[in-house]
Amino acid sequence: MKFKSILPFAFLVLGVNACTDEDEGVGASVQPVGDLLSAFSNRIDVSSSSVFVDSVLYKADFLYLGQYTDTYLGTTQCEFLSQFDARIGGISVPDTSLFSYTNKLGISKDWLTKIDPDYGNIKAVTNPNKVQVDSAFFLIRFDDEVLGDTNALQAINVYALTANLPTFAKHYTNVNPDDYCDKGRLLGSLAYQTANRKMKKYASNGDNEIPRILEVPISLDFAKEVVNAYKKNSSIKNQRQFNEKFPGIYVAHSFNEGAIVKINTCFLRIYYHFQGKIHTTYKGKDTIVDSKSLGRANPLVKSLSIACDKSVERVNVFKHPNNSSLKTLAQSSEFTYATSPASLYTQVVVDFNSIRDSIVRKVGPDSSKLSVNSALLKLKAASINWDTKLKKTPNQYMMLINRDSIADFFYWNKTPDGLYSFNAGLDTSDFSFSFDLSRAVQKRLKGAKNSEKLLENLVVIPVYITSSGERRYYHQQLWPTASRFYKSSADEVKLRPCIDLVYTRRE
């Protein structure tokens, strides 16, 4: 076999530059004109600072509750407001459905056999009447991710809202609860220690999930009003009408500080019983039992549960009562900080003129044949070195984003586009975050439309990522965290924030 052609080839030689502009592209004497691809690199220093932020958009899978004081971050207090997911049309009171197992949430089919083995299973319940509320609780389930002193005694109050949260609105964490609640109707209170909350199995499908739970006793008068909304003759026919009658609840931190918890679910549960005709068998023959005749053994006991979930309007309220500690951190001459929730951002100033000038000095003003291969903004992180219950290493993911676009980014579930938003994970090999700015730098060098807005007003914020199938979702971090980065004043050059720029020019 003969090869009748010779494949041409080209050499790509990278000229590596640290902080100077003296290096030139190499390889011109090797390749013919028109085939040459010269490479260059620059290091561009950037400046950074900490800026205080008093609120962020609330759009999260979780709610947060409690109060914790850190030596340097000061006090963080978490409360929340929420509507109820009424499920109008999906719930009726009294509920006569039957369950095949003994459960305080339903009517057990085999209840009568426990009274008299000659009875058979309950087949149906008819003529339900005389509903009576027995008790009501606002239940708050949280996982093991707790921050603070779990043995400290703290308390919460649950109030009825007097005004509705705006529908389909952007809710921010500095919302004033007084705009929606005059605190004139206290529904319930609870003093608790996080460590002592009993563990309860609540999964009936064998998964054995065991969350911690807070049970706040709720006013029976309020519970009766809610139950009436689900009766057959109720005038409430949809969620909007329900919200007009019951705008929601405000869960407020009452006293003392201890721990902050991450809430998985929370809901109002009302227990009630009623009377009715129980259709069953006795010694194999059909019979009807009047529940009144059973007295305290009446099996017609049910519950009504309505959740404060993501399908309704809700918002966390974050307060930093003594933010002087945060402001002191923001003035640090050694580090910048990105903390959560709603406290400090690291602001990064990218001087695009410095980027352009460094390129012009090497290749001239013509950028038509220029390609930006890499423009990595590197931030070197440092562990927290003070006594704290916070995680001392940086948040796993950071986002560099135009500050004015933060709310829209998270509200519309956007993903980093490499123009106005950039994501980076912690590189544990050198404890740094690297944000790829190459696309934005390229567009601005080429003078693309509106490119003058790129790389402006940038801040670094902590985020976390979830996924569903192949889709990734980015969420602003609302759990208390603290990350810090070296400033340009760091003694070691390698610790200073900078952009490592690599670009090529076709001759």
Description of each model-found segment:
Residues 2-9, 13-507:
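Secreted, disulfide-rich extracellular signaling modules
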